[in-house]
UniProtKB/Swiss-Prot annotation:
Catalytic activity: N-formimidoyl-L-glutamate + H2O = formamide + L-glutamate
Disulfide-bond pairs as recorded: none
Lineage, opening ranks: Bacteria, Pseudomonadati, Pseudomonadota, Gammaproteobacteria, Enterobacterales
One Pfam family from the record: Arginase
Top-level taxonomic group: Bacteria
Cofactor note: Binds 2 manganese ions per subunit.
Pathway recorded for this protein: Amino-acid degradation; L-histidine degradation into L-glutamate; L-glutamate from N-formimidoyl-L-glutamate (hydrolase route): step 1/1
Keywords: Histidine metabolism, Hydrolase, Manganese, Metal-binding
PANTHER family: ARGINASE/AGMATINASE (PTHR11358), FORMIMIDOYLGLUTAMASE (PTHR11358:SF35)
GO BP annotations listed: L-histidine catabolic process to glutamate and formamide; L-histidine catabolic process to glutamate and formate; putrescine biosynthetic process from arginine, via agmatine
The name this protein goes by in its record: Formimidoylglutamase
Length: 312
């Protein structure tokens, strides 16, 4: 498969505690690695999308292309509990030069193949351009189902641009659905009115996007989520790490001045994971160039750890 590489074996390393007990295991010891892109009929396919071309096109801070393996390393040494032995590392899709669209197509095909084989997909971006590819792959895999997109994000990412960027994925997914006379079901939780122009707010209204603003997150998120999940056959969850406060997550292209603390996000993530409807999830916009002593990587990896643990 072009634009794809297996994950180097030295990425998955950590402390070995098996001398204490046979079940004293960590992620690096229970995760399976695939040397070839051959989807299984079950499990969680962990994939990377090493891209910041979309961030570059959107005039953001580049560096997210390095994120997938940094996040793998941060996850590797965490304890392995229920659900983590389902993880299968299916490698990373890469962008050659500025050929973002080709890489997005490759990731989309890979996601579709995994989903149709019986796997669910967990993708480490990369910028939020990851979502156009990941979301399209899920929609292609389930053409007759109501796939609801839930975005935990300070930004709507409904920009109108000549080329795909990290700011356009949900407009692209809306256009994809419209071309197929398919309902576009999109909810954005944690969105910042200060971080989105009136034009973007108007576009969200035109597309009937469900919104929970950052200021009202604690009050409204869980009740709104109940209504969103009731409309879904399957859910694609995309977590833009810039939804977190800059103090918790400095390592993103656009750090949040306000943001939603991780302890407030986690009940929402848990409810989605335990709904039985979660089909796909990703974490995007992590930029290791701006991390502080690995703080952001560890938090992002912990969020991924929780998703895999809670995923029903």
């Amino acid at each position: 498969m072009t634009l794809w590489r297996p994950t180097p074996s030295d990425i998955w390393q950590g402390r070995d505690d098996r001398a204490e007990a046979s079940n004293a295991l960590r992620i690096f010891q229970t995760l399976r690695q695939s040397e070839h892109f051959i989807p299984a009929n079950s499990g969680i396919a962990l994939m990377g999308f090493a891209s910041d071309e979309g961030v570059k096109r959107n005039h953001g801070r580049t560096g997210a292309a390095q994120a997938p393996d940094v996040l793998r390393k941060a996850l590797a040494n965490m304890a392995s509990h229920h659900g983590h032995d389902r993880l299968v590392d299916m490698g990373t899709f890469t962008v050659e030069a500025d050929q973002l669209e080709a890489a997005q197509h490759a990731l989309s095909d890979g996601v579709q193949a995994c989903q149709q084989a019986g796997m669910r997909t967990l993708v480490f971006g990369g910028g939020h351009e990851t979502a156009w590819a990941h979301g399209r792959g899920v929609l292609e895999a389930f053409p007759d189902d109501r796939v609801v997109i839930i975005n935990l994000d300070a930004h709507l990412d409904l920009r109108n641009a000549e080329r795909a960027t990290s700011g356009t994925p949900f407009r692209q997914l809306a256009q994809y659905c419209a071309a197929r006379q398919r309902e576009f079901q999109y909810a954005c939780f944690g969105v910042s009115r200060a971080g989105n122009t009136q034009a973007l707010w108007d576009e969200a209204g035109r597309l009937n996007v469900t919104l929970v603003e950052d200021l009202h997150f604690r009050r409204d998120a869980l009740s709104t989520l109940d209504a969103v999940l009731a409309q879904a056959d399957r859910v694609y969850l995309t977590l833009d790490l810039d939804v977190l406060p800059a103090g918790e997550m400095p390592a993103v292209s656009a750090p949040a001045a306000l943001g939603i603390p991780a302890l407030d996000l986690l009940p929402v993530i848990e409810q989605i994971c335990r709904s039985g409807k979660l089909q796909a999830a990703d974490l995007v916009e992590f930029n290791p160039l701006y991390d502080r002593e690995g703080q952001g990587a560890r938090l992002a990896a912990r969020l991924a750890w929780q998703i895999a643990h809670w995923w029903a």
